[in-house]
Regions:
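Cofactor-cradling patches in redox/metallo enzymes
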Residues: 21-123, 130-131
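The C-terminal output helix
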Residues: 127-139
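Short, flexible coil/linker segments at domain boundaries that flank nucleotide/cofactor-interacting
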Residues: 1-4, 84
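N-terminal pre-triad scaffold of radical SAM enzymes
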Residues: 10-14
């Protein structure tokens, strides 16, 4: 039996709005994924530590504070430093298109903005992780 996709949903920084993160976490659970939700006010170090401890396949950041150009690169760097460069870093929030393009050039996966459907992010995560697992099997 193939294991469930493990997703860490995190709310970095001082943003106190977590309704979107909770909706995402519920949709991923409903799709059969194992979800670890960090709660509010996480530092990049806390997120990376939890990702390592939980051995996740995906880290999803929910950012509505405008600090995405700092938080995504900081988490990416810490994941890489902890041997988790193969973990998909994705997320969403109110992020301008130009910033999305820059973040993706830094190695961040697809980013979802308000209005994205749960089907979109569930399918994206499933496709990316299953592709990684298939590549690992073929070596």
């Amino acid at each position: 039996m193939e294991r469930k996709i493990r997703v860490l949903v995190a709310k970095p920084g001082l943003d106190g709005h977590d309704r979107g993160a909770r909706v995402v976490a519920a949709a991923l659970r409903d799709a059969g994924m194992e979800v670890i939700y960090t709660g509010l006010h996480q530092t990049p170090e806390m997120i990376a530590r939890t990702a390592v401890q939980e051995d996740v396949d995906v880290v999803g950041l929910s950012i509505h504070s405008g600090a995405h150009m700092t938080l995504f690169p900081d988490v990416k760097k810490l994941l890489d430093e902890n041997g988790m460069s193969d973990v998909l870093l994705t997320g969403g929030g109110v992020i301008p298109d130009d910033d999305i393009e820059q973040l993706q050039k830094m190695g961040v996966g697809r980013l979802f903005t308000p209005g994205a459907s749960s089907e979109e992010f569930v399918n994206y995560i499933r496709e990316q992780v299953e592709k990684k697992w298939a590549q690992a099997k073929t070596g």
